């Protein structure tokens, strides 16, 4: 769901300057590398449950076509020492975007386009909301807790059709009505001060997304959606 929001946001922001393609299945990545797609930037949502698979494909893709590789997700390390260790263990990863990804990803794409797509020249100075290692393997980090995207300005990946192909393949639709978490779990990035700010998506957009799913998902025999909130993921019927 997070990658869907980022995809819709970037495509809306940069319009025809870029072409964003969302992939979920490993075989799609294999086809992209082996075929004619040859992406300039490949981003992964990395979590505990998919870390080994993500590392495997990141290295494979980097060795094959050498695109810009970046990691994002709420389970990236928080402290600078842990972030440095994480990136040094993964030399095939160029950049990481901690916490919410829309603004950091936008800054990476802007820097990439303005640097003639040269990855090393992108690292001459810090990128807001992004971490990376410089030529001396020192961590470069600037304002990781940047002001998050305004949810009123965020296109819905459901209403823009980003997920349509995945519904046809039987994946469970997911919805999100709020971002942020009031809990203070020390092990979780959502326990940070910034993440405690509860922000709601516009009610009109949320309702339109539900109606959109009702029309499309019912026809393929799916009757269950999940609510993916920062404080937990549960079936919509339980909410």
Residues covered by each model-derived region:
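Glycine-rich beta-alpha loop elements in corrinoid/cobalamin-binding modules
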Residues: 9, 13, 18-145
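Active-site phosphate/pyrophosphate- and oxyanion-stabilizing loops and adjacent acidic/basic residues
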Residues: 8, 59, 84-85, 152, ...
């Amino acid at each position: 769901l997070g990658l869907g929001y980022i995809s819709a946001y970037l495509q809306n922001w940069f319009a025809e300057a870029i072409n964003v393609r969302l992939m979920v299945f490993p075989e799609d990545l294999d086809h992209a590398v082996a075929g004619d797609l040859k992406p300039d930037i490949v981003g992964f949502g990395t979590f505990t449950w998919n870390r080994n698979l993500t590392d495997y494909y990141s290295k494979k893709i980097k060795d094959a076509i050498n695109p810009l590789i970046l990691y994002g997700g709420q389970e990236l390390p928080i402290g600078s020492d842990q972030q440095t260790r994480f990136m040094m263990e993964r030399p095939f990863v160029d950049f990481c975007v901690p916490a919410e990804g829309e603004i950091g990803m936008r800054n990476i794409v802007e820097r990439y386009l303005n640097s003639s797509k040269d990855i090393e020249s992108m690292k001459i100075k810090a990128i807001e909301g992004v971490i990376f290692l410089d030529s001396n393997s020192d961590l470069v980090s600037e304002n990781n807790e940047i002001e998050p995207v305004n949810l009123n300005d965020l296109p819905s990946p459901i209403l823009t059709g980003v997920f349509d192909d995945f519904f046809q393949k039987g994946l469970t639709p997911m919805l999100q009505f709020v971002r942020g978490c009031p809990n203070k779990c020390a092990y979780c990035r959502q326990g940070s001060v910034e993440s405690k700010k509860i922000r709601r998506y516009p009610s009109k957009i949320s309702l339109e997304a539900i109606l959109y799913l009702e029309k499309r998902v019912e026809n393929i025999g799916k009757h269950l959606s999940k609510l993916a909130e920062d404080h937990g993921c549960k079936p919509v019927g339980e909410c």
